[in-house]
Amino acid sequence: SIRTVPEFEAAQAARRRAKALAKAPESHLATVRRARKINRILGETYPYAVAELDFDNPFELLIATVLSAQTTDVRVNSVTGALFARYPDAAALASARTEEVEPYIQSLGFYRAKARSIVTLSQQLVERHNGQVPSTLEELVELAGVGRKTANVVLGNAFDVPGLTVDTHFGRLARRMGFTTADAPE
């Protein structure tokens, strides 16, 4: 269809306004509303979203989460059954030598470092927390091999404490959706 000059100019002006609005910064309230909408949609789409790691108690979840770095939950689940059968609690794992633990997790990447980490972590649980997994972020991140991500996984799944578990992929999505410009999850 042939447009008249005024129609063409009006269409051009509308495109310029739309472009300007797209570049305009989103208000804080609009960002919060958009985040809540996304959260609602995800909650409706995935109502039973749970950790894929197999665990029966906070200790098992903590150890499994430490072991999950740089590997899949499926791979971790393939080794934790035998590991927890031999070392069912912090006291048992704390008394083990690293070399004794390594064969149980050697199919995981970085298994030597992870074995050292979970033995040291278990020793710290016994010494500082009477063998129990603490239920605060501050206490968890003081343990060997436990960062904010691991702590939030444990808090959310073992103690029902809400928090954000930010990994590389979630961080990238949050930046792409404009929720943050930060590279670090803190």
Walk through the language-model features, giving the residues of each.
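Catalytic cores of DNA base-excision repair glycosylases
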Residues: K23-E186
